């Protein structure tokens, strides 16, 4: 039987500044090559859990440790941060604090320089992993010239050069827009498939991060693991609600459409779910019914009501809107309805309001 590469046994940790333990009686094994998602609400203990693995706890951040933690068959509590970094690579949420070099290339080559690797080999390694993380065109750029997603990729490339068997990513989607976040997850999955490393992703944005490429999900609540299961089984359970985590909206939609989610084999794979003819039929029926009800509702309700609305900007002497009572404006025709200034500058809106 394969030995776990990470093993927690009755493990608890309490910060010196806290009155109660942040982690309580953690018992979990993670095996070589697994891809694990760690989720939980803010303050649930998920980042502390990750820091115990990468060595920031207890070697940098002090506290009281009880129980056992073994990493790569070594007692993690008697090692040191330097030795741990040879086994566990971490991409921090704040990549600015992890950037060391003056350029992207220098940052990725930092460890190779410390290990006195030959220049030719160093350049080959940097180019290889820069290509893998899609940063080959930005190697000569300074940190301040890179976006948050690009800095993250540089940090990831520097970790991959070290080829550690365990890779931790602490909230990799935190500072990314949805499109970049999706691309980042695709990149991480490709890297996991190529390197066969043990990958642990810590996230609170469940809907954006969860899919069926994860072997397991660890769900934290109040410093405890309340679920250790597959993505699909987690979505079928009530554990997310118990932990204060909103389930993916498509799961909610399926329930509104009266789809039996328990009967769906791979609920974590949205594409497979959408290909089911039974699901298509149920969802279409629900949408048609909802749309019909909405049409009847809006026939008897105004699209927009204004009641004594006044608007004046600091750089304008006159009011843009002054005691407006009602304006039947077609809000569907307004491109940027969320921008009040743009709305008020529209000639169509001005005419309707004046009228």
Give the location of each predicted region.
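Catalytic Walker B motif of ABC-type/P-loop ATPase nucleotide-binding domains
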Residues: 167-171
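Helix N-cap at the start of a conserved alpha-helix in ABC-type nucleotide-binding domains
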Residues: 178-180
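Conserved beta-strand-loop-alpha-helix hinge in the C-terminal portion
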Residues: 224-251
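ABC ATPase NBD coupling module
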Residues: 64, 74-89, 234-235
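Conserved ABC ATPase "signature" region
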Residues: 120-138
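Conserved ABC ATPase signature
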Residues: 142-146, 150
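Hydrophobic anchor residue at the start of the ABC signature
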Residues: 156-157, 184
């Amino acid at each position: 039987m394969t030995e776990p590469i990470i093993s927690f046994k009755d493990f608890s940790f309490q910060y010196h500044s806290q009155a109660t333990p942040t982690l309580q009686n953690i018992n979990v094994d993670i095996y070589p090559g697994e891809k694990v998602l760690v989720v939980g609400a803010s303050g649930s203990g998920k980042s502390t859990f990750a820091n115990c693995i990468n060595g920031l706890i207890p070697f940098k951040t002090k506290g009281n440790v009880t129980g056992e933690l073994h990493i790569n068959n070594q007692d993690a509590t008697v090692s040191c941060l330097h030795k741990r970094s040879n086994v566990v690579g971490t991409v921090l949420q704040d990549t600015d604090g992890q950037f060391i070099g003056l350029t992207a290339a220098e940052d990725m080559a930092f460890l190779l320089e410390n290990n006195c690797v030959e220049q030719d080999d160093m350049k080959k390694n940097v180019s290889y992993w820069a290509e893998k993380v899609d940063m080959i065109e930005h190697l000569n750029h300074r940190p301040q010239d890179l976006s948050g997603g690009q800095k993250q990729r540089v940090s990831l490339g520097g970790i991959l050069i070290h080829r550690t068997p365990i890779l931790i990513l602490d909230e990799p989607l935190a500072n990314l827009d949805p499109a970049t976040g999706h691309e980042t997850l695709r990149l991480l999955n490709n890297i996991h498939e190529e390197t066969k490393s043990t990958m642990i992703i810590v996230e609170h944005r469940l809907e954006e991060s969860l899919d069926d490429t994860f072997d397991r999900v660890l769900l934290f609540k109040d410093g405890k693991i309340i679920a250790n299961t597959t993505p699909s089984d987690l979505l079928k359970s009530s554990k997310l609600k118990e932990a204060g985590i909103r389930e993916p909206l498509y799961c909610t939609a399926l329930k509104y459409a009266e789809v039996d989610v328990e009967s769906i084999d791979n609920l974590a794979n949205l594409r497979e779910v959408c290909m089911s003819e039974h699901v298509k039929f149920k969802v279409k029926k629900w949408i048609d019914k909802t749309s019909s009800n909405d049409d009847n509702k809006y026939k008897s309700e105004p699209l927009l009501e204004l009641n004594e609305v006044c608007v004046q900007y600091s750089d304008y002497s006159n009011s843009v809107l002054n005691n407006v009572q009602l304006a039947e404006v077609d809000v569907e025709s307004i491109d940027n309805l969320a921008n009040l200034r743009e709305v008020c500058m529209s000639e169509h809106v001005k005419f309707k309001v004046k009228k």
